Every structure is written in structure tokens, then in C-alpha cells.
Amino acid sequence: VSEEEASRIKRGFENSFLLPYPKKEAVVTISLKDVYHKVNASLTHEIIPNDILIHQRGTNHITPHRYLLQNGNAADCIDVAIMAEGYTEKEMDIFYKDAQTACDALFSHEPFKKLKEKFNIVAVASPSEDSGVSIPGQGKWKSTAVSSHFNTFYSDRYLTTSRVKSIHNWLAGIPYEHIIILANTDTYG
């Protein structure tokens, strides 16, 4: 971490690892390596498929979504999810229009243009309570799907979210390998 803030503040960040749900007990080990491939830290976790504390998602209550581009099944294509952030239920038609604009813009450039037939793009209508995104530097806090905000690392236009679990919960049951969070703001961030 090269930001100045990292020299004075220690912080933890959510992370998610997507893997097939095991049919029988499995052991998963995650290792963090340095630039010399030396393991600095590792975590081992046993997964017991019938554990009552595992919340299986993606079978019920799947977030409403619409394919903007569908060139094949999920196994054969690169699946990109475009998530709504800062769009209320009433603004979902605007979100779908904005998502189509983003999709069209992506495929107007190489190498995406020549590889368009290898992609599926799905717009995911993750509703927010408030319209727009938070701007802490102006004292504006919004209740949104994944709690995104400007002023990350105290930079005015640095827009991000730390709610990685929320992102994946909204996308549960929808095929994706890559995620674009489309924020309802006119500010470039």
C-alpha cells in the first residue's frame, strides 16, 4: 500500500473467495505470499457442506437482473455483472439505460470490440434506499446497496466501497467473473 495514509493507519478489508460448493467435506487453505513467493500468512478452513451456520445464497431471492449482451452460456463466456449503486427502485429504468450505455462504450474499444462475442453482460438491479453516493468531504452520507463513497484515502474523486461481502450477496445466483459497480453520480471517480 503506497498511500500516505497506510503509514499511519492500520486497517482490515473484507475479501471473498469464490469456489464451487463442495459435495463433501473439504479443506481450503489461503496463503498470502510476498514478492519473493515466501508465505507471510495463511488461513486454513474446513468446509462441512451440511453445517447449519453456512448461509447458502443464490438459490432464492436472486436480485432482479437483465442481460444486456448474451453470447452463450456462462461456462463458455466471460460473464460481467454491472451492479446498480445509488439507484433507488424508482430509478431502475435509468440504471438499465446507463448500464447499456456503459456496455456499448466498453465494446466500442479494442480488444473488447473484436472479442465481443466472448462476453455476457448482465445488469443487476441492486436497489439503494437513497439516490446517489456518499460524499463524506461534504458531509453527505447515503444509504446505498454497497455503501460506496468518495474521499477514499482523502482523495476527492476516489470512489470505492469496502463492502465486498455485500457485493457478492447481491450477485449470488447470477453468473459472473468480473464486476462493474455503476454509481449514480455525475462526478468522475
Model-inferred region functions:
Residues 48-57, 86-88, 143-157:
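Acidic/glycine-enriched edge-of-secondary-structure segments
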Residues 56-108, 113, 123-135, 165-166, ...:
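Fold-level signature of zinc-dependent metallopeptidase catalytic domains
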Residues 8-10, 19-21, 71-73, 112, ...:
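Sterically constrained small-residue positions within well-ordered secondary structures
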Residues 118-189:
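Active-site-proximal segments of metallohydrolase catalytic domains
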Residues 36-40, 89, 186-189:
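Short, surface-exposed beta-strand/loop "edge" segments at domain boundaries and coil↔beta transitions
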Residues 13, 24-26, 76, 117, ...:
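Residues at beta-strand starts and edge strands
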Residues 1-55:
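Beta-strand-enriched, solvent-exposed domains that form extended recognition/catalytic surfaces
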Residues 28-30, 80, 180:
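Hydrophobic beta-strand residues in large extracellular and virion-surface proteins
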